[in-house]
Regions:
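Glycine/charged-rich beta-loop-alpha catalytic/anionic-binding loops adjacent to active sites
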Residues: 76-80, 103-113, 255
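Generic enzyme active-site microenvironment
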Residues: 7
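Short catalytic-loop micro-motif centered on adjacent basic/acidic residues
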Residues: 59, 80, 112, 227-228
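Class I S-adenosyl-L-methionine
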Residues: 34-103
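Mixed-charge interfacial surface used for oligomerization/domain docking
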Residues: 2-3, 11-29, 33-34, 87-90, ...
């Protein structure tokens, strides 16, 4: 079996990977008075609570070049995954670290993948890389296959709150406040360019669920793997699991709590859904 290290920034929500040499590189969430490092010591629920009451600016900070260089290690081949470059500088710093490591040791091969997404969709890419590695695929073939596979994965999200997006200037504060008051959930997707694209608005959990299922069908889901990350919303995640299994027979679906960075964007009640087409 060809062995290589898999590295990803913490937007993937994965801290460890059974049977693989895996390293998570933390992003950081900051306010004027608090800092939350998205590692295995982070209390996500506490972070969510603090951010809900934050009146000032909040923002995320990407890993620096030294963080990525340390994660890549001193030798061996590496495939690395980052949150979409449209939301973060993580891809840029990872590429700079790749260049540095390959200059130190020209025999190394480091592939950095801009996921153009976050959370559950990155998890699917990582699982694909691990599966290919376990099957003994050549490193260069794995890198090509991941880029091709990325064309057939998607991310949908549904947000109960847009407080943090408003606090870091990504959405209008008045619109975010009104949506919260009216109980409107924003549903969107990661576009093919890696931007956040709003698709519609729903009121209530059932309508949100139906909207997500409809969008999965529209985007070509017929089965395969589905990953659902939630921020303090296990009930919707469970209902989605059941409905997805009913609507797409043979689908393999898993749900889990989001970690720090994705919980920052999804906020309490939010759902992120990655799937194949």
């Amino acid at each position: 079996m060809n062995q290589f290290r898999i590295v990803a920034d913490s937007s993937c929500d994965i801290l460890s990977l059974d049977g693989a040499d895996f390293v998570s590189v933390p992003l950081t969430i900051r306010t004027d008075t608090e800092e939350f490092r998205d590692d295995d010591f982070l209390d996500v629920n506490e972070m969510v609570t603090v951010l809900r009451s934050t009146k000032g600016r909040s923002y995320s900070a990407c890993p620096n070049i030294a963080d990525w260089t340390e994660a890549f290690g001193d030798s061996g081949d590496v495939i690395a995954f980052t949150i979409t470059s449209s939301l973060s500088g993580s891809y840029s710093t990872a590429c700079a670290a790749k260049k540095h490591c390959e200059e130190l040791d020209p025999s190394r091969r480091i592939c950095v993948v801009d996921s153009l997404s976050a959370g559950p969709e990155i998890a699917l890419l990582i699982e694909k890389a691990q599966s290919a590695m376990c099957a003994g695929a050549d490193f260069d073939d794995v890198c090509r296959d991941i880029q091709a596979y990325r064309e057939h994965t998607h991310l949908l999200f549904a947000l109960e709150s847009m407080h943090n997006l408003a606090q870091n200037g990504r959405v209008n504060k008045l619109a975010a406040t009104m949506a919260g008051v009216l109980g409107i959930r924003a549903v969107g997707q990661a576009s093919s360019e890696g931007t956040l694209e709003m698709l519609g608005k729903c009121r209530g959990q059932r309508k949100t669920q139906e909207f997500l299922l409809h969008e999965m069908e529209r985007l070509g889901c017929k089965g395969g793997s589905v990953r659902i990350g939630h921020c303090q919303n296990p009930s919707l995640a469970l209902e989605l699991c059941v409905e997805i299994q009913h609507r797409f027979p043979g689908v393999e679906v898993k749900s889990y709590p989001l970690r720090g960075l994705c919980s920052y964007y999804a906020e309490r009640g939010g759902i992120m859904l990655g799937f194949e087409s």
